[in-house]
């Protein structure tokens, strides 16, 4: 069985800890000019992503679920690389890892929270197959995809994100949201590109990110240069939606 309610409960705790250490780090730096609490903040920042691996996974029992959470605790990307010889920074990291282990030990099956939206990290063989399929279809790898340079995707439409913002809700409706799920494929601090299965399309955040449907029949790509590109079967409806912005196309 899956423990999605517990996973949501755990996720909310990780978010709370991340924000707590973010605030404390700023305050300590303001007070003393120095703080290593960023180590704790980045630990929980990474955990908020990694717990998404647990969504919809089946476990034999709750003990197996807890064991899977513990396996996520070691940092994949060390935020203390600049301080490898700084024992204080490493001590902060070990202390934070233990804080997380202790919390997982205290988790119970009754620790449950409702999910505000669906978000699952795609990993393993499923991720490998999906990465290959997206590369074959759209020549996209969660890295800068320049829409003017020759590529096999055919016709595209691109414009600056600012001209799309007034149409955001209607664009989401064109994608089938909220009644369907999309793949969100973008750059990440924690992986060589992260793929999430989501039922919400987040507003532009300034990073490389693409949204695709389950059949990969279209792509919406946001670049770090404030542009958005559309290609595939969604192109016709998007042209109708953005007809008033034609002077800003391409």
Give residue ranges: language-model regions.
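Structured alpha/beta or helical-core interaction and ligand-binding surfaces enriched in interleaved
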Residues: 1-250
